[in-house]
């Protein structure tokens, strides 16, 4: 298989690509750092072709009550120190961004989300 690969440095909220440019969009452990994750997910939807795949590995607020509450108590300090908002709800943000969740699975005490989404 011959492939041409190129790399671009860009703002995730305003990607420099035409609509429907990609068959697959992949993002890993990044939405916690986006100032406006909903806008980023809208951009993913825009650049992914109709029928394409958006594959995400994200972390967020645990669905284990005690751990989710602990994350909430320490979220501000963690975000200030590391720029990571670790108690966001990835599935809600993805849907607010206009993506359709095809399949999702939570792992590691409900913190990690493996998500297959598609553009609307």
Residue ranges and their predicted role:
Residues 42, 55-114:
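C-terminal alpha-helical "lid/dimerization" subdomain adjacent to the S-adenosyl-L-methionine
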Residues 8, 26, 55:
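Conserved Rossmann-like nucleotide-binding pocket used by diverse enzymes
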Residues 13-25:
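A short acidic, Gly/Pro-enriched loop at the edge of an enzyme's catalytic core
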Residues 38-50:
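A short glycine-rich, Lys/Arg-flanked "PGG" loop and its adjoining helix->strand segment in the class I
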Residues 23-36:
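A short SAM/SAH-binding and catalytic strip from SAM-dependent methyltransferases
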């Amino acid at each position: 298989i011959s492939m041409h690969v190129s790399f671009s440095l860009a703002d995730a909220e305003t990607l420099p690509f035409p609509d429907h440019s990609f068959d697959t969009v992949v993002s890993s452990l990044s939405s916690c750092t986006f100032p406006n994750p909903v806008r980023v997910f809208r951009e993913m939807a825009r650049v992914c072709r109709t029928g394409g795949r958006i594959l995400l590995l994200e972390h967020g607020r645990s669905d284990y009550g005690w751990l989710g509450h602990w994350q909430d108590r320490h979220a501000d300090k963690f975000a200030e120190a590391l720029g990571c908002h670790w108690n966001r709800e990835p599935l809600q943000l993805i849907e607010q961004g206009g993506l359709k969740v095809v399949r999702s699975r939570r792992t590691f005490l409900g913190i990690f989300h493996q998500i297959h989404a598609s553009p609307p």
